Amino acid sequence: MTGREQITIVRHVPLSVLNKRIKHPKGLPEVVPRLVFIRLRYKGMSVVDAAEAVGVSHQTGYNWQKRWNEEGPGGLVP
């Protein structure tokens, strides 16, 4: 993991709910990488490392986290 994380992740839902939504995306498969990113953040991975793990730019990771923190799961729907 890189450096110290400055942005905290808001835990809108329990980890078990994230896991369920990843496994059963309900017709929104494009949300799965975003949910995986959030799950990695829940587990303590930095934004940069989590973004790299799901194959997106660091800026996209910061954008996803901002939307998640402000809007919850609905913020990840494109």
Can you say where each PLM-predicted feature lies in the sequence?
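Short, basic alpha-helical/linker "hinge" immediately adjacent to a nucleic-acid-recognition surface
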Residues: 1-32, 38-78
